[in-house]
C-alpha cells in the first residue's frame, strides 16, 4: 500500500505535466488498482481509528486523477443512455453476483464505479457518487444523494430526498460521515464534513453544515460539526445576541440509548417531544 500511495502522491504533484496520450503504464495501472480497491471496499477514504476519523488524502488524489485521465464514453442503460468518464458500478454484474453480495438495487438507482456497497443493503432510486462507502444493513431511500467520499455506517436509514454532502476538494477537508445505527429523516441535508455519531435520529428537514449551531437543550451546550451519539435532533431556531431576531439551529431535544432505540419506532421518538 505504501508503494501505491507513493506513486499516487508523486503523480498528483505533477498532474499538470501528465501526457494523456502517453501515460506511463505503471501510473495508469496504479490509479486503476486504487479505484478498484475502493470499489471493493478493501480500502476507504476515511476510517475510524482510536475513536477518531482519519481521512486519507492520497485516496482522494487517486479519485481526482482517475477522473482526470478518463475520457467520456457511451454507457448503455436498459431505458436510457449516458455519456460520462466514470462507469456505473454494476454495469457488468449478473444475477449471480447480486445474489452473492445480497444487495438490492432498484432502478433507476445510479451508483458510480469506485463506490462501495456492503452486504444486505437496499438502494432505492437514488444517486451514490465515487468514493462513497455504504456499510451493511443500510437503506438508501428514493431520491437520496450520497456525495463523493461520504461514509455511511451499518444499519443506517437514509430517508427519501436526503442529501449527504460529498467532498473531493479541498483535499484537506473531511467527508460527511453518518455512523452506525442512525436514522436521517426525509429531505434533510448533512454536508461539509459533519459527523453524525452513532445511534442518532435526525428528524425530517434538518439542515446541518459546519457553521450550523447544534444546541443541546438539556445542558445548553452548542456543538459545531458533529452531533453527539444517541441524539434526537429537530430543526429550530436560537435568538440572536441582541434578541432582535432568531437564526436557524439544529436542536437536540433528547438522548436515546441503543436499547430504547431498538424497541421504539422512530416516529414515536419524534412525536414524544415536550
Curated annotation (Swiss-Prot):
The signal peptide, as residue positions, is none
In this chain, substrate is annotated as bound at 104, 141
Subcellular locations according to the entry: Cytoplasm
> Which Gene Ontology CC terms are recorded?
cytoplasm
Q: What is its EC number?
A: 2.3.1.117
Q: Which domain of life is it from?
A: Bacteria
Q: Which Gene3D superfamilies did the record assign?
A: Hexapeptide repeat proteins, Tetrahydrodipicolinate-N-succinyltransferase, N-terminal domain
Q: Which of UniProt's keywords are assigned here?
A: Acyltransferase, Amino-acid biosynthesis, Cytoplasm, Diaminopimelate biosynthesis, Lysine biosynthesis, Repeat, Transferase
Tell me the enzyme class.
transferase
Catalyzed reactions: (S)-2,3,4,5-tetrahydrodipicolinate + succinyl-CoA + H2O = (S)-2-succinylamino-6-oxoheptanedioate + CoA
Q: Which pathway, per its entry?
A: Amino-acid biosynthesis; L-lysine biosynthesis via DAP pathway; LL-2,6-diaminopimelate from (S)-tetrahydrodipicolinate (succinylase route): step 1/3
Question: One GO molecular-function annotation for this sequence?
Answer: 2,3,4,5-tetrahydropyridine-2,6-dicarboxylate N-succinyltransferase activity
Its main localization is: cytoplasm
What is the name of this protein?
Answer: 2,3,4,5-tetrahydropyridine-2,6-dicarboxylate N-succinyltransferase
Organism of origin = Buchnera aphidicola subsp. Acyrthosiphon pisum (strain APS)
Write the gene name. dapD
